[in-house]
């Protein structure tokens, strides 16, 4: 492979689509705290002065959706109408129904191991050894830029920052290896009382320099900081937001394929979410075991059926053992039936609000990021 560029983007927790994701997952967490067996499909729409929460929820729990919504928006940082959105005064509308009994009968089983998939679909998981968290570098550093933006906004270092922001990083590769960063884009919402020059200098010093490794930066690296010149109107006032609209930001930044299903607001019986997490877990353990430098897993399901309809392992020519053997190891060491993967990763717990900003993968404290199967895989493969 010759020299090439690859770009990934991220968005902050204050981006309208991410506000929606976080509200959906905050509702999910509140329900799972009381009722781990709940069926939740919670969608959120945000626009100036309004939040609409809808979907299908079947549960014995009672949660205050309005209060959860306001608390989530408040924690993100929208607390004044000057920002274009105010947690304290926005309207919160709810349109919640129950899960269809036709779906329910295919998912629930007397024997939990026979729990069927909540829908048909295909999911992908990916890992690469180009970063310490076994994630692609472009999306990893795009996330870290907007995480840093939120950090210096909330701790008062740059008090004129506002919650909405986007980042984009272009990496240069030579023969599949990173040789540098070609371009960095960071657009951040701000208050009226900061000049573009002061903003650009502060963002460079307080956000970009602390995050990006100096060995990848050069005199040729291009920086675009608030390139439109002004970003005062942002958040839901600038754009409406919707749950599930940032599926590439949520996953691998375009470096791996995507089955199309979004994550936020869905309980773990929805394989769109849980099987994508499981596929990441499998791929990461294969790479951590040294069985491949890059690994992509595809898994697919039929609604109401427990066993996956297919499992595929792709290693892009980096495998250390035959891919047929890798596929056999995946089937031996990972239970990818819906109930099996829920148990394997302990998914029936309220951990989802935190996943809804800055990427679902590459943050080590989530259970699907564990590499506890790596040694077993390596031994079984016969590698020393």
From Swiss-Prot:
Compartments where found: Cytoplasm
Pathway(s) per entry: Amino-acid biosynthesis; S-adenosyl-L-methionine biosynthesis; S-adenosyl-L-methionine from L-methionine: step 1/1
Positions bound to L-methionine: 56, 99, 239, 270
Residues given in the record as ATP binding sites: 15, 164-166, 230-231, 239, 245-246, 262, 266
InterPro entries: ADOMET_SYNTHASE_CS (IPR022631), S-AdoMet_synt_C (IPR022630), S-AdoMet_synt_central (IPR022629), S-AdoMet_synt_N (IPR022628), S-AdoMet_synthetase (IPR002133), S-AdoMet_synthetase_sfam (IPR022636)
UniProt: K(+) binding residues: 43
A GO term from the CC aspect: cytoplasm
Major enzyme class: transferase
Catalytic activity: L-methionine + ATP + H2O = S-adenosyl-L-methionine + phosphate + diphosphate
One Pfam family, short name: S-AdoMet_synt_N
Protein EC: 2.5.1.6
Annotated positions binding Mg(2+): 17
MF GO annotations: ATP binding; magnesium ion binding; methionine adenosyltransferase activity
Cofactors that this protein relies on: Mg(2+); K(+)
SUPFAM superfamilies, sorted: S-adenosylmethionine synthetase (SSF55973)
Entry note: cofactor: Binds 2 divalent ions per subunit. Binds 1 potassium ion per subunit.
A GO biological process held by the record: S-adenosylmethionine biosynthetic process
PROSITE patterns xref list: ADOMET_SYNTHASE_1, ADOMET_SYNTHASE_2
Superkingdom to which the source organism belongs: Bacteria
Keyword set, alphabetical order: ATP-binding, Cytoplasm, Magnesium, Metal-binding, Nucleotide-binding, One-carbon metabolism, Potassium, Transferase
Annotated stretches, region: Flexible loop: 99-109
Family named by the database record: Belongs to the AdoMet synthase family.
Subunit text: Homotetramer; dimer of dimers.
Annotated function: Catalyzes the formation of S-adenosylmethionine (AdoMet) from methionine and ATP. The overall synthetic reaction is composed of two sequential steps, AdoMet formation and the subsequent tripolyphosphate hydrolysis which occurs prior to release of AdoMet from the enzyme.
Protein's UniProt name: S-adenosylmethionine synthase
Species the sequence originates in: Serratia proteamaculans (strain 568)
Native organism taxonomy: Bacteria, Pseudomonadati, Pseudomonadota, Gammaproteobacteria, Enterobacterales
Gene this chain is encoded by: metK
């Amino acid at each position: 492979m010759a020299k090439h560029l690859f770009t990934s983007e991220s968005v902050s927790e204050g981006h309208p689509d991410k506000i929606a994701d976080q509200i959906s997952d905050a509702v999910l967490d509140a329900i799972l705290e009381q009722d781990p067996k709940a069926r939740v499909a919670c969608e959120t729409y945000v626009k100036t002065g309004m939040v609409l929460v809808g979907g299908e929820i079947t549960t014995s729990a009672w949660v205050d959706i309005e209060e959860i919504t306001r608390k989530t928006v408040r924690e993100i940082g929208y607390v004044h109408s000057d920002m274009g959105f105010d947690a304290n005064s926005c309207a919160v509308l709810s349109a919640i129904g129950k899960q269809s009994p036709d779906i329910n009968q295919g998912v629930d089983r007397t024997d939990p191991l026979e729990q069927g998939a909540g829908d048909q679909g295909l999911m992908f998981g990916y890992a690469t050894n180009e970063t310490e968290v076994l994630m692609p570098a472009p999306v990893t550093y795009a996330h870290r830029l907007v995480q840093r933006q939120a950090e210096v906004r909330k701790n008062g270092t740059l008090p004129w920052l506002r919650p909405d922001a986007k980042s984009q990083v272009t990496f240069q590769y030579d023969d599949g290896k990173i040789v540098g960063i070609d371009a960095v884009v960071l657009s951040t919402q701000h208050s009226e009382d900061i000049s573009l020059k002061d903003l650009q200098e502060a963002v460079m010093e307080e956000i970009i320099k602390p995050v990006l490794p100096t060995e990848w930066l050069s005199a040729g690296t291009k920086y675009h900081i608030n390139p439109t010149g002004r970003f005062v109107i942002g958040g839901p006032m600038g754009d409406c937001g919707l749950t599930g609209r940032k599926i590439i930001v949520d996953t691998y930044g375009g470096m791996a394929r995507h089955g199309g299903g979004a994550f936020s607001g869905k309980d773990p019986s929805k394989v769109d979410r849980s099987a994508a997490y499981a596929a990441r877990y499998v791929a990461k353990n294969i790479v951590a075991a040294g069985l491949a430098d890059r690994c992509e897993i595809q898994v697919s399901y039929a609604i109401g059926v427990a066993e996956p309809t297919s499992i595929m392992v792709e290693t892009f020519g980096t495998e250390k053992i035959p891919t047929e053997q890798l596929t056999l190891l995946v089937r031996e060491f990972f239970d990818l039936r819906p109930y099996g993967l829920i148990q394997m990763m302990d998914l029936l717990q309220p951990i989802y609000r935190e996943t809804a900003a800055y990427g679902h993968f590459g943050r080590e404290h989530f259970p699907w990021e564990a590499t506890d199967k790596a040694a077993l895989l390596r031994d079984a493969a016969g590698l020393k």
